Amino acid sequence: MTQMSDEQFRIFIETIKSLGPIKEEPPSKGSFSNCTVRFSGQRDHDAVDEFINAVETYKEVEGISDKDALKGLPLLFKSIAVVWWKGVRRDAKTWSDALQLLRDHFSPTKPSYQIYMEIFETKQSYDEVIDSFICKQRALLAKLPEGRHDEETELDFIYGLMQPKYRESIPRHEVKTFRELLDRGRTVERTRH
């Protein structure tokens, strides 16, 4: 085995550095120190998505680099999330790694059959407005694998779960998009109230 002197090692390292592309990250303009969003470690898909979306938006607006975001992420954790982070932080080499670890642990993907069960057991309640009902149902449909159903099929699912007052006033064959269904549903609400 060959050994290098300190001087040889220094020259070796400088040579390697000079051969590689210079990749400097732009200086970060901010940190998470003023971010008010917090995550407590609840195992809830929607809560995790909401947290990640808020943090990503804050990061972008404040110009926080991935490197600084990764360092500052623990500032946004409370409760069990703090304990969890202590155990996994070495596995998070990048910002993307950290977000994926967060999703994997606190927001495991539900199997499709469970999502379908949620969709079909949730009929529109009597006093629920059309906007709210369709929004909730579409959020559930969005959890299914990409491209599973076209809009026409998704409309069929949701139409069957709507209150009769909407179905009686809006023939299914007359609406081709969710936008049309919402517009027609709002008209029903204005004329029936």
UniProtKB/Swiss-Prot annotation:
It is found in: Extracellular vesicle membrane. GO terms for molecular function: identical protein binding; RNA binding; structural molecule activity. InterPro entries: Ty3_capsid (IPR045358). Keywords: Membrane, RNA-binding, Transport. GO terms for cellular component: extracellular vesicle; membrane; virus-like capsid. The keyword Protein transport does not apply. Its main location: membrane. The keyword Cell wall biogenesis/degradation does not apply. Homooligomer; homooligomerizes into virion-like capsids. The protein is evolutionarily related to retrotransposon Gag proteins. It contains structural elements found within viral Gag polyproteins originated from the Ty3/gypsy retrotransposon family and retains the ability to form virion-like capsid structures that can mediate mRNA transfer between cells. Tetrapod and fly Arc protein-coding genes originated independently from distinct lineages of Ty3/gypsy retrotransposons. Self-assembles into virion-like capsids that encapsulate RNAs and mediate intercellular RNA transfer. Arc2 protein is released from cells in extracellular vesicles that mediate the transfer of mRNA into neighboring cells. Belongs to the ARC/ARG3.1 family. This is Activity-regulated cytoskeleton associated protein 2. The gene is Arc2.
